[in-house]
Amino acid sequence: MPNDRESGPSGLSPRELERYKRQLILPGWGLAAQARLREAVVFVAGAGGLGSPVTQYLAAAGVGTLRVCDSGVVELSNLNRQLLHADRDVSHPKVRSANRTLRRVNPHVRIVPLEAVIDDHSVEALVGDAGLIVDCLDNFPTRLVLNAFAVRRSLPMIHAGVTGYCGQITFLHPPATACLACIVPEAPPPEVFPILGATAGLLGCLEALEALKFLAGGGTLLTGRLLFCDGSTMQFQEVAIEKDPRCPVCGRR
């Protein structure tokens, strides 16, 4: 991080104030909201098609610490949608190129690259002191592990998923809302699915927007609502989702 901390009461340096000035004039934003972003710690699960736009926009907006977790290596077939990575990164860990790219996006942000598998044993240490989880994963078994941890710790989690031209997104914060297991009780069988880079970009940007609204304290979140996006027809549909009292993960909370 650059050492230019001649800051005012907000804790933001002159360079940071200049960097963020266009969002600082948003109605209801201001220095207080920007300072909240600067103090925030966000856990981003996945540095791929969704994680690329999520982490870049959170870094650009000035979120203080991003814990970016991915166990995979960059493959050539990733590069149509995973803009954190480039040709030179093929066969190397995704978190390595993610760390390099995000530091270029905003040197004021702390990046914690975590090359690890998320499972029942590792999830607590990986999430660490994050106050928000952003699900940018591409497999449901790991999503459900992350969801169960979020429920136990009462942590908010933003979920999104994409396939082809389509995607979905919601904001989960049990016990006030349903959890992911209320919506998808069991992991569907694994498959290789088609995906267009722009679809992942769209849903990732929506996840970043939800995260920034939550952290800054403005706007209406997608709590209790699942937003479906069909890029092939440009139709957006919202459905209400309710907590399942019989859910084995959150039903008794």
Question: What do these predicted regions represent?
Answer:
Residues 1-253:
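Adenine nucleotide-associated cytosolic modules
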